[in-house]
UniProtKB/Swiss-Prot annotation:
UniProt keyword rRNA-binding present: yes
Function: Binds directly to 16S ribosomal RNA.
Domain of life: Bacteria
Any one GO molecular function term: structural constituent of ribosome
Annotated protein name in UniProt: Small ribosomal subunit protein bS20
One Gene Ontology cellular component annotation held by this UniProt entry: small ribosomal subunit
Family assignment from sequence similarity: Belongs to the bacterial ribosomal protein bS20 family.
SUPFAM superfamilies: Ribosomal protein S20 (SSF46992)
Species of provenance: Campylobacter jejuni subsp. doylei (strain ATCC BAA-1458 / RM4099 / 269.97)
Region described as Disordered: 1-20
One Pfam assignment: Ribosomal_S20p
Amino acid sequence: MANHKSAEKRARQTIKKTERNRFYRTRLKNITKAVREAAANGDKNAANEALKVANKSIHAMVSHGFIKKQTASRRVSRLALLVNKIA
């Protein structure tokens, strides 16, 4: 248990940041999974819609400071390549 006021505040902040990061991490996994599943099923329309949602969500995470801009671009690029491979 924290003995100083500043240490108590840091503990509170850590809890809030942990919850926020867990939310973003889970969301990132879920939207990526949705695109990959749609691509695996060969459904071009569903894959494109999922990619559109993923693109918007991933770049929103950049503005919230969860991931860096280059990381977001790389993830979106790889998902787009996957969707474009669908015949």
